[in-house]
């Protein structure tokens, strides 16, 4: 592993990417977003979130997401504080009636299943598990009323298409889209709760969850509320729905997060929307995977090309190349956050290819890796 013996190498400036941020979240924030914060600071920061300037900002975010995902009639953009981690608990309290089914194939898909298993008001979930780097096929079960999986498993770089599985019946489809939303293709009509935090494809900060909820999901929220189930106010979906429809959050939101998100939505929509974003991430990922398959010392960690993510690429290295040393040298040269997910424990690099990342910078990254490996 990389240590004090890792050589000090200065990558030629001509090889380096223009922007060296490849983190899988928090991710690259475009300079134009930061400039927009400066331009609007006086009218937004330090003002009440119950008044027009901030409410208009929330409305701008909700309208932007509705346009980006071409929401069907009756679908609503709901939001609350706490990130996707908070939404897992909110869904356990307010979206699952009796029992859920979870596909788990990495750290984050497993965490939702774990949160549900700890909730005292619902039954033990069904968990269908596969090893990291692969994924189970979405399936239904007559005993469940929610079926959940991750559009993109950030820890491993596995992407699972979003389609209502055969045999799902009336079960709600809940998709963790934290690293998929805005960078992978999706038909929102195939989901009932498509939820995410904005620090990945949307190039914002964390601490906020957003969920695109279907009429069926909104009706489920109402029915669970009517049942009298106890729910902490902070995790209450009916409170989140009520406030969201007023372009508010239950408690004070981080204005910076909302403003960065709004700017990124404007940028995505101005360039062609989700179709453009998906083509861009496809371009970046094709460059990364083609390089990895061409080199004798690298292979894509995800063996099945159909499961390889367009937005988070994981690349294994042969035993004679220390990927940790490569990442350390990259970081010393301003090319950062290419380390693998900490708990995966593999000799690999992980590369985010969200829309804000230039495809040419992905190619430049691969050239830098080649340059380093030649000198190790």
Swiss-Prot record:
Pathway(s) this gene product operates in, as recorded in its UniProt entry: Amino-acid biosynthesis; L-serine biosynthesis; L-serine from 3-phospho-D-glycerate: step 2/3; Cofactor biosynthesis; pyridoxine 5'-phosphate biosynthesis; pyridoxine 5'-phosphate from D-erythrose 4-phosphate: step 3/5
Cofactor binding note from Swiss-Prot or TrEMBL: Binds 1 pyridoxal phosphate per subunit.
Q: Which GO terms describe its molecular function?
A: alanine-glyoxylate transaminase activity; L-serine-pyruvate transaminase activity; O-phospho-L-serine:2-oxoglutarate aminotransferase activity; pyridoxal phosphate binding
Protein localization: Cytoplasm
Q: Where does pyridoxal 5'-phosphate bind?
A: 84-85, 108, 154, 176, 199, 251-252
Q: What is its EC number?
A: 2.6.1.52
Domain of life, per the record? Bacteria
Chain positions covered by the region annotation Disordered: 1-30
- Kindly list the positions at which N6-(pyridoxal phosphate)lysine occurs in this protein: 200
- Tell me the cofactors it needs: pyridoxal 5'-phosphate
Question: What's this protein's name?
Answer: Putative phosphoserine aminotransferase
- What taxonomic ancestry is recorded? Bacteria, Bacillati, Actinomycetota, Actinomycetes, Mycobacteriales
Name of the coding gene: serC
